[in-house]
Curated annotation (Swiss-Prot):
PANTHER family: VACUOLAR PROTEIN SORTING 26 RELATED. InterPro entries: Arrestin-like_C, Vps26-related. One of its GO terms (biological process) is intracellular protein transport. Keywords: Cytoplasm, Endosome, Membrane, Protein transport, Transport. GO terms for cellular component: cytosol; early endosome; endosome; endosome membrane; retromer complex; vesicle. This is Vacuolar protein sorting-associated protein 26A-A. Residues 315-326 have a biased composition (Low complexity). The gene is vps26a-a. Component of the heterotrimeric retromer cargo-selective complex (CSC) which is believed to associate with variable sorting nexins to form functionally distinct retromer complex variants. Acts as a component of the retromer cargo-selective complex (CSC). The CSC is believed to be the core functional component of retromer or respective retromer complex variants acting to prevent missorting of selected transmembrane cargo proteins into the lysosomal degradation pathway. Retromer mediates retrograde transport of cargo proteins from endosomes to the trans-Golgi network (TGN). Belongs to the VPS26 family. It is found in: Cytoplasm; Endosome membrane; Early endosome. It is a peripheral membrane protein.
Length: 326
């Protein structure tokens, strides 16, 4: 709540009401504290329109101001440097010239076909948010109200979506072939694949498939990478034999990941990897990582009216030094 204090409480409050609030879809986003917030959902190119209501709580009071404005803001904030926020979108509409308010007032606003180039995101070290910001400019302290929105980026891909197929192993000890049905998956997709054991001369006790998220912030020597295991899928528990084939079926939607986000405004990236992990009887861990792309598929009714952003092909993943690679 934003208000200007008088002797007996707030003189006024600021409200922001969207014109299509009754019909516009609401989406959820998880904050850095783990709480879930709900806000109205927008796509790139959509207009943002509504009313700003200045509601007086104390009849007879006066509010002198040096102008009233509303801004549409797209902002990136790095948590390790909160003093250095970057605005990649800032549109301003002047609602009122300097003057005096003595009663409640409503102001219409509209930002036409607003460019929203990135998806809303809150991660371990970075937040990308969109919001409407109403400011009543005053001599000493401005009166400010922020109203958060959520933006989803929709992507389309050509029909060609190559499968991932690799043979990996440890010389004279283990040789396996794994295959995933695609290299790009939408957020409601299913990862389907199989593991085929060509040679088994070490005793494998456990095998699992992990969906790994890597959030990379900063550039150059100041780069920070946060790694999170989004999902684990147990492929087998026990020793495999030569010639054995084990199917994989991992439902992505159950883990609610974000899309792949690459080099967002030269501030951060979010990348996803499938990590195949094997554990032998001496508790040694072997792994093989393969990068995949996650993308947000457009509903049919949205496809006809929304601009899409084609994603870049992923770069070759780098091997981790934490565990021996297969």
């Amino acid at each position: 709540m934003s208000f200007l204090s008088g002797f007996f409480g707030p003189i006024c409050e600021i409200e922001v009401v969207l014109n299509d609030a009754e019909t516009r879809k609401v989406s959820e986003i998880k904050t850095e504290e783990g709480k879930v917030e709900k806000h109205f959902l927008f796509y790139d190119g959509e207009s943002v329109a509504g009313k700003v209501n200045i509601v007086f709580k104390q009849p007879g009071k006066r509010l002198e101001h040096h102008g009233i404005r509303i801004e549409f803001v797209g902002q990136i904030e790095l948590f390790n440097d909160k003093s250095n926020t970057h605005e990649f979108v800032n549109l301003v509409k002047e609602l009122a010239l300097p003057g005096e308010l003595t009663q409640s007032r409503n102001y219409d606003f509209e930002f036409m076909q607003v460019e929203k180039p990135y998806e809303s995101y809150i991660g371990s070290n970075v937040r990308l948010r969109y919001f409407l910001k109403v400011t009543i400019v005053r001599r000493l302290t401005d009166l400010v109200k922020e109203y958060d929105l959520i933006v989803h980026q929709l992507a389309t891909y050509p029909d060609v979506n190559n499968s991932i197929k690799m043979e990996v192993g440890i010389e004279d000890c283990l040789h396996i072939e794994f295959e995933y049905n695609k290299s790009k998956y939408h957020l409601k997709d299913v990862i389907v694949g199989k593991i085929y054991f060509l040679l088994v001369r070490i005793k494998i006790q456990h095998m699992e498939l992990q969906l790994i998220k890597k959030e990379i912030t900063g550039i150059g020597p100041s780069t920070t990478t946060e790694t999170e295991t989004v999902a684990k899928y147990e492929i087998m528990d026990g020793a495999p034999v030569k010639g054995e084939s084990i199917p994989i079926r991992l439902f992505i939607a159950g883990y609610d990941p974000t899309p792949t986000m690459r080099d967002v405004n030269k501030k951060f990236s979010v990348r996803y990897f499938l990590n195949l992990v094997l554990v032998d009887e001496e508790d040694r861990r072997y792994f093989k990582q393969q990068e995949i792309v996650l993308w947000r598929k457009a509903p049919e009714k949205i496809k006809k009216r929304t601009n899409f952003h084609q994603r870049f092909e992923p770069q070759e993943p780098q091997a981790s030094a934490e565990e021996p690679e297969i």
